[in-house]
Amino acid sequence: MVHSISILGSTGSIGRQTVAVAEHLGLNVRALTTNRNIQLAEEQARRLHPAFVAVTDETAARALRIALADTDIAVGSGENALCEAAVLSDTDAVVTAVSGAVGLRPTLAAIEKGRRIALANKETLVCAGDIVMRRARECGAEIVPVDSEHSAIFQCLTGREGELHKILLTGSGGPFRGWTREETRDVTPEMAVHHPNWSMGAKISVDSATMMNKGLEFIEAMHLFGVTPDDIQVLIHPESVVHSMVELLDGTVIAQLGVPDMSLPIQYALTYPERKPSRSDRLDFTAYPGGLHFYAPDLEALPCLALAMQCARTGGTAPTVMNAANEVAVHLFLDHKIGYHSIYESVAAAVEAIAPVAAPDLDVIRAADQEARAFVRSYFRF
């Protein structure tokens, strides 16, 4: 179990839940970061007394410095401040709860210091999984996943090295489960952000609706557990009780179950290999008299998932391009600037137009990321 942490993205959905878990466990929070939500960041800082708060938005950072002038809390600004928060001294673990590819640099910085990474930023592995996992091995840094599915797989595989046959990656199917492609044409942002089982931020809620989130998790699982696309099967599981499963060499299937509450995998990433009492509700099997259900995904109705699985097989910079294009497209959709189907159409166009580079270094990955973002903006003439 760790005793001191830095929380990157403390004002987001996962970050806020991490703060609550840290308070429950009595952890020392050394650093917090936010993009621009300084009202909540100030409240968290006064409650947790970190040594450092990073604000990526420069204007917001200046305002927070003034607000915290009566304290001894240092305030940094810009993306470099994220890295500063990630490598702060006397920190056992870094929770990477920032959204998007911006999480890559601070994650690598923390890895270089040998920190435990409680990884909630899946884009880090989607964009640079080979590099991140290699550096973690070289630096002796633990990567413990926070995503509920990967935490489940991690828990199922603990102590079973060399026994894995297949990963069974579950997903609820999102708010439009069972809808045809045509039926989703007029979906609005307000409809897409309403997830039936989980409480999440707007961007990841849209990704869950399109099932791009499951595609990103598919790629993340490949890197975390050293498997190929053929070793992962995606299953739609509407109840979100079985968070994922593993099939072992002898045909045994082991599953991790629990209520859909992100505080559980967050806490496990911080207490591993120990377990501590949590404040989460307990699973009541009698609440599911109709049983638990599992279905194969309809890839025609879920083209974003199919595209992600295709990019996983292509490898190189293809997942980076897909992820960057999707980030831009989803934010345009949330701003009511493009339609729901335009998310997939623009991301697929970017993947088709930008040739993948095999075995990329970080500079090539960054260039592919920027090219994909520019492509989508140009695609919609923004």
Question: Model-predicted segments: where are they?
Answer:
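Catalytic, metal-anchored helix/loop core of enzyme active sites in primary metabolism
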Residues: 1-382
